[in-house]
Amino acid sequence: MRSNGSVRSYAAALLLAALGAHGADLSSPTGSSGLIMIDKVGGHVRFFDPKSDQELSSLVPGPDETIKPHDLAISPDHKRAYVTIYGDGVYGRNPHPGHTIAIIDLGSRKMVGSIDVSPYEAPHGIRVDASGRLYVACDLSRKVLVIDPRTGKIESAIDVEGTGHRLALLPDASKLYVANKSDRLFISVVDVKTRKMVGRVAMPNGTEGIAASPDGKTVLAADLTEPYLHVIATATDTEVDKIKVEGAEHGVYTIFYSPDGKRVLICLASGQVDILDAHDLHAPQRTVHSAGTALMGIGFAPDGNTALVGNHAQGTVSRIDLTHASLVGTFAAGKGVEMLAYF
């Protein structure tokens, strides 16, 4: 029979394992049921057969095709997708901002509702925790919203001081890190329990791409103008390392941990994808050149070896073999995919 101490240790280990699994799946979901793509340029959400790469259906998640979708989160049970409707522009130039989050049933591939976040505007980055609660950055309003999607209620509107564009949520949902792009030269740190901003991590040139490690110990932030990753220790919320992105001349768009937590993939405007060892960021990097440019989104196939990369500027998606760091093929997908995910 276990002692009380060993029972507690065993329970803690199970909890940590569960959090790690949730963290990987919630930030970089995967699955064999389907493939969803956010065709930002085309103003559509598109569904593809994950085996044949053939488009199955599409829908307009905003009021019309001009009010564009940008980001998405998949619910923990993989039954729903939540898509932010940003507006008719891009960061810094969004004259008619959106104010809704589309709710999509993944089984039927139909839009089943929306959440109106008014008076807040321009919802962009979105994350979901293990309970299903949503965290949404409304950049024009300088707020991160905490939303219960079951009721559509905005539980909190957290002032983050900057035009937060993308988010990283720790796997245990204890803290949230907000990339303020070029508006504020720091990352805003939010205590999720108190729903308050509790710190800043200086970013010399600003940052857009941001991702939390599956163990919750590290946040990676992409330098907005120079080819570096800033490594942040979440225990202290301080920068502890800086990684040069090999072969790059400019900043990084986005960062993704693979669902198994073994790899870090980073996307660059030039069309370059760099693959890093998540457990040794200083290990030699491997580079793949996609068949397009302005890379933003990555979807991880359930085989653990394949990733799809959205070529935002070309209206195509490229398939990458992660083991061999090679380009396998490319297929047409809307007019310009920003984010995508298997489910």
Enumerate the predicted regions with their spans.
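Bacterial N-terminal signal peptides that target proteins for export
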Residues: 1-11
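Residue-identity detector for glycine
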Residues: 5, 20-23
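Bacterial N-terminal signal peptides
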Residues: 10-20
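Predominantly soluble domains enriched in secretory-pathway, periplasmic, or organellar proteins
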Residues: 22-343
